[in-house]
């Protein structure tokens, strides 16, 4: 059989934006048969009894119908779980990625821009690019702290529509200084912009901004259930003042959360103590893994408030290939930003997975 031609017809190609043609689709690493420590997933599955109970519940859903008002039950449950302040509202997305894209869509005004520290989550820049908004990246300091002076200067110069602050940051896994964050939030507010605090890794962090967001009318708090333990469900949520959420919600596609997604999320929140225990295990394993990594000659490990640890090795490409050859999959981020030269991002797994990682890493250095 002749393989189909993979070259796009020039007449069709001209319909595709030039900047899109120059991009690459998001690549997912092949992980079959590997110890998978590349994507910051919860390493724990649901206990068998709960898995069976969830299966029965999903099997009873009317999949021939569009999602109904039960999605509002989920919104209320999430608001309760996150202790949403009075006068605030909550918006759901098909993962945080959709919420980030919808923010760019809603804030696409003439001269609008998006600002974020770098290195950071790639979707902040990508959403801006796809929406035709200017993206301003401000480098962190060499020890991955916010460069307050550079951030304030960029805010004053560009007056960004949206400023993202990941708390903790991906891929550096650290929580930034609270006073610096507050100064940035105030500076953005004076310029009439929005600040989005991205708490994707909140289940593993020692602090949250949730208790402080009611101080400001221009701050949104975004989270995801992916790190909670439901990466396969794809559900993110964003909280903010009611009037602000109401405007952004206008660009949300109808029925963007499937009945399967919101029923899984409701089930998880009903059993939140199970997921909280899993998160605490990850935090405990993170400490063990950090100490072991720090003891390896030639390895620099950074303290983490997430379910990942950033390390620097003598040769990232060699270490990555050595780990992959030994059936351990991690993320080589050494080309992502100059500050990340020879850096690898390791997801914290179970005790057994972390032991396999350490056994494979030492001979790979």
Curated annotation (Swiss-Prot):
Under Enzyme Commission nomenclature, its number is 2.6.1.9
Which InterPro entries does the annotation name? Aminotransferase_I/II_large, HisP_aminotrans, PyrdxlP-dep_Trfase, PyrdxlP-dep_Trfase_major, PyrdxlP-dep_Trfase_small
Q: Which reaction does it catalyse?
A: L-histidinol phosphate + 2-oxoglutarate = 3-(imidazol-4-yl)-2-oxopropyl phosphate + L-glutamate
> Which cofactors, by name?
pyridoxal 5'-phosphate
Q: Per its record, what are the GO molecular function terms?
A: histidinol-phosphate transaminase activity; pyridoxal phosphate binding
Keyword Transferase included in the entry's annotation: yes
Xref: Gene3D superfamilies: Aspartate Aminotransferase, domain 1 (3.90.1150.10), Type I PLP-dependent aspartate aminotransferase-like (Major domain) (3.40.640.10)
Give the pathway listed in the UniProt entry for this protein: Amino-acid biosynthesis; L-histidine biosynthesis; L-histidine from 5-phospho-alpha-D-ribose 1-diphosphate: step 7/9
Read off the Pfam families from this record: Aminotran_1_2 (PF00155)
Residue numbers bearing the N6-(pyridoxal phosphate)lysine modification = 227
Record's keyword terms, sorted? Amino-acid biosynthesis, Aminotransferase, Histidine biosynthesis, Pyridoxal phosphate, Transferase
Class of enzymatic activity (EC top level): transferase
Single Gene Ontology BP term? L-histidine biosynthetic process
| Protein family | Belongs to the class-II pyridoxal-phosphate-dependent aminotransferase family. Histidinol-phosphate aminotransferase subfamily.
Name of this protein = Histidinol-phosphate aminotransferase
**What is the organism of origin for this protein?**
Polaromonas naphthalenivorans (strain CJ2)
Q: What gene name does this entry carry?
A: hisC
